[in-house]
Swiss-Prot record:
Database matches in SUPFAM superfamilies: Ribonuclease H-like
E.C. numbers: 3.1.13.-
Record: residues binding Mg(2+) 1: D35
Any one Gene Ontology molecular-function term assigned to this protein's record: 3'-5' exonuclease activity
InterPro entries from the UniProt entry: Exonuclease_RNaseT/DNA_pol3, RNase_T, RNaseH-like_sf, RNaseH_sf
UniProt name for this protein: Ribonuclease T
Assembly description: Homodimer.
Source organism of this protein record: Pseudomonas aeruginosa (strain ATCC 15692 / DSM 22644 / CIP 104116 / JCM 14847 / LMG 12228 / 1C / PRS 101 / PAO1)
Pfam families: RNase_T (PF00929)
Annotated site residues (Important for substrate binding and specificity) in this chain: F41, F89, F136, F158
Source superkingdom: Bacteria
Lineage of the organism: Bacteria, Pseudomonadati, Pseudomonadota, Gammaproteobacteria, Pseudomonadales
Record's GO cellular component terms: cytosol
Binding site for Mg(2+) 2: D35, E37, H193, D198
Biological process according to GO: DNA replication proofreading; tRNA processing
Length: 224
C-alpha cells in the first residue's frame, strides 16, 4: 500500500481553518522520536525491554525542539526470547529491584495517550516515527501493538524518518554517538543504550538537522 493510499484510508481528518505550522511542515504528520531496547533483533520473538518516545514541538519561528519524553521499562511478554548478548550490550538487569517494569499494553496505552494530545495540539492527523535506524524501532513497536491488540495506534504503520540516514547526509556520520558529536552535541557513552537517553539524543539530533536545513533556506512555510 502506498502512503497516499494509506492517507485515503485514514479515518481521522485535519481540523478546518488555518493549519498549525507543524502540520504544514510534515504534511499533517507529527514527528515522534522512539527508541527501544530489546532482547534481540527479531521483533516477533524477542522481548521488548524498554521504550521511550519524545514528542517534537515547534516554536513561533518554525524551529523544532524536543518536547516531552515518555519512558517505560517493560516486562517481557510471555514466551519472549532474550539473548544474553543483548542484555550484556544494553546493560539491562531484569532482576534489578528498582527496575519497576510494566506490561507492554500499559506502557503503549500511556505513550499513545500523550501522543494523541500532542497531535491535537499541533493540528496533526498522525504521528510519524523518528528513530536511529528507524525500521528496527518501528518493527518492535508494531509487533508490540499487534501482541496487545491495541486498536488506536497513532503511528503511521510503515513510514518513518531515519536519523542514521539524515545524519549521514548532514554530517557524514551514521553512528548515533558520532553523529551527535559531529553536530556539536554532548554524548555520554556511559548513558547510551538506555531508551530514554538514546531517544532524547536522537530527538535533539533530528531537530538540529531539520532546523539547520531551514536556516539554509531548504524549507519555507508557504504561510510565511
Amino acid at each position: 500500500m502506498s502512503e497516499d493510499n494509506f492517507d485515503d484510508e485514514f479515518d481521522g481528518s485535519l481540523p478546518s481553518g488555518p493549519r498549525h505550522p507543524m502540520a504544514r511542515r510534515f504534511r499533517g504528520y507529527l514527528p515522534v522520536v522512539v527508541d527501544v531496547e530489546t532482547g534481540g533483533f527479531n521483533s516477533a520473538t524477542d522481548a521488548l525491554l524498554e521504550i521511550a518516545a519524545t514528542t517534537v514541538g515547534m516554536d513561533e519561528k518554525g524551529f523544532l525542539f524536543p518536547e516531552h519524553t515518555y519512558f517505560f521499562r517493560i516486562e517481557p511478554f510471555e514466551g519472549a526470547n532474550i539473548e544474553p548478548a543483548a542484555l550484556e550490550f544494553t546493560g539491562i538487569k531484569l532482576d534489578h529491584p528498582l527496575r519497576m517494569a510494566v506490561q507492554e499494553e500499559a506502557a503503549l496505552t500511556e505513550i499513545f495517550r500523550g501522543i494523541r494530545k500532542a497531535l491535537k495540539a499541533n493540528g496533526c492527523k498522525r504521528a510519524i516515527l523518528v528513530g536511529h535506524n528507524s525500521s528496527f524501532d518501528l518493527g518492535f513497536l508494531n509487533a508490540a501493538v499487534a501482541r496487545t491488540g491495541i486498536k488506536r495506534n497513532p503511528f503511521h504503520p510503515f513510514s518513518s524518518f531515519d536519523t542514521a540516514t539524515l545524519a549521514g547526509l548532514a554530517y557524514g556520520q551514521t553512528v548515533l554517538a558520532k553523529a551527535c558529536q559531529a553536530a556539536g552535541m554532548e554524548f555520554d557513552n556511559r548513558e547510551a543504550h538506555s531508551a530514554r537517553y538514546d531517544t532524547e539524543k536522537t530527538a535533539e539530533l533530528f531537530c538540529g538537522i531539520v532546523n539547520r536545513w531551514k536556516e539554509m533556506g531548504g524549507w519555507m512555510d508557504d504561510d510565511d
